């Protein structure tokens, strides 16, 4: 079956066989945006205290997964420059095996569309989808909370994808409160550069003392990203792309970048701006969604 990277289209066409790809089952791995990101302090262990609002996008990768009896994990295709044992997909499968004693293995095929290192959660989303999907296929019966405890060992953003709802995150990202921000349309652009998260979080100009505010107040104020100024100053490609996008709509950085996004009230307006984008940047148009497409998909097949 032809894959559609807008999951709502696949969901609307759902049938008993629509999630099958041969012997494999297909699972969505959606993108996310940080609608705002504020850094409230730095802890003694080096981690930063933050407040951020996560929302999923109706767009992302697909993972085709089937169980195998020999306990081996086979992943295709291999990501360029990433050793198999360092790949988050491979590590997610192994951590579930190790923590449940499951003797089954898996064949996993990644259909990758999300940019790597873009701040839209591609790797974290892939890891979360593998944990949730294999928990279903292997019948290991861990709760979402137990899966999230495994996921955080793989990356700070993995639990939000396992959690499955748009959420306000505090602390180092581990304290989650369900939230329902407006589900707007977004133009997401990826400048031709890669961001060093370590550079951003160690930069002397990074704000580290933004006062904590209650969610009710944050939702009514203009959204911002404390990492944006540093990234714009250090990466001219991001500065150029964001400056262009700001001519058309409220726009900002997601996470530490490199992706930037603009929000619109409807698809037509978003698509019109996207169609004018500079040729040097890639990107996509997608709608925000407060319920993860992965969990919507699981609701259908369960």
From Swiss-Prot:
InterPro entries recorded = GHMP_kinase_C_dom, GHMP_kinase_C_sf, GHMP_kinase_N_dom, IspE, Ribosomal_Su5_D2-typ_SF, Ribsml_uS5_D2-typ_fold_subgr
Q: Please give the Pfam families that the UniProt record associates with this protein.
A: GHMP_kinases_C, GHMP_kinases_N
Catalytic activity of the protein = 4-CDP-2-C-methyl-D-erythritol + ATP = 4-CDP-2-C-methyl-D-erythritol 2-phosphate + ADP + H(+)
Q: Which gene encodes it?
A: ispE
Give the first-level EC class, as a single word: transferase
The identity of this protein, by name, is 4-diphosphocytidyl-2-C-methyl-D-erythritol kinase
Keywords of this entry: ATP-binding, Isoprene biosynthesis, Kinase, Nucleotide-binding, Transferase
Q: Which organism is it from?
A: Actinobacillus succinogenes (strain ATCC 55618 / DSM 22257 / CCUG 43843 / 130Z)
Provide the disulphide bond pattern.
Answer: none
Q: Which residues form the active site?
A: 32, 157
Instruction: Identify the residues that bind ATP.
Output: 115-125
Superkingdom, taxonomy of origin: Bacteria
Provide the family line: Belongs to the GHMP kinase family. IspE subfamily.
Pathway named in the protein's UniProt entry: Isoprenoid biosynthesis; isopentenyl diphosphate biosynthesis via DXP pathway; isopentenyl diphosphate from 1-deoxy-D-xylulose 5-phosphate: step 3/6
PANTHER family in the record? 4-DIPHOSPHOCYTIDYL-2-C-METHYL-D-ERYTHRITOL KINASE, CHLOROPLASTIC (PTHR43527:SF2)
Q: Say what the protein does.
A: Catalyzes the phosphorylation of the position 2 hydroxy group of 4-diphosphocytidyl-2C-methyl-D-erythritol.
């Amino acid at each position: 079956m032809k894959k559609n990277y807008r999951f709502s289209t696949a969901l609307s066409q759902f049938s008993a066989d629509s999630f099958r790809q041969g012997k494999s089952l297909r699972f969505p791995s959606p993108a996310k945006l940080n609608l705002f990101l504020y850094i409230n302090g730095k802890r003694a262990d080096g981690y930063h205290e933050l407040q951020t609002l996560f929302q999923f996008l109706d767009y992302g990768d697909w993972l085709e997964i089937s169980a195998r009896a020999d306990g081996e994990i086979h992943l295709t295709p291999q990501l360029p420059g990433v050793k198999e044992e360092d790949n988050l997909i491979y590590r997610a499968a192994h951590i579930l095996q190790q923590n449940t004693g499951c003797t089954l293995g898996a064949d996993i095929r990644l259909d990758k569309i999300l940019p790597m290192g873009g701040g839209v959660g591609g790797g974290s989303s892939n890891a979360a989808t593998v944990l949730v999907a294999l928990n279903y296929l292997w019948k290991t019966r861990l709760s979402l909370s137990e899966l999230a405890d495994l996921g955080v060992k793989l990356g700070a953003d993995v639990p939000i994808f396992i959690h499955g709802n748009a959420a306000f995150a505090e602390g180092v990202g581990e304290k989650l409160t369900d939230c329902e921000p407006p589900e707007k349309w977004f133009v997401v652009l990826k400048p031709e550069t890669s961001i060093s998260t370590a550079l951003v979080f160690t930069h002397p100009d990074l704000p580290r003392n933004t006062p904590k505010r209650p969610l009710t107040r944050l939702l009514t104020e203009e959204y911002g990203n404390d990492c944006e100024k540093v990234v714009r100053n250090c990466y001219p490609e991001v500065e150029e792309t964001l400056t262009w996008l700001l001519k058309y709509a409220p726009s900002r950085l997601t996470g530490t970048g490199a992706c930037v996004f603009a929000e619109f009230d409807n698809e037509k307006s978003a698509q019109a701006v996207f169609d004018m984008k500079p040729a040097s940047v890639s990107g996509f148009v997608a709608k925000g969604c407060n319920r993860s497409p992965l969990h919507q998909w699981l609701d259908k097949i369960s």
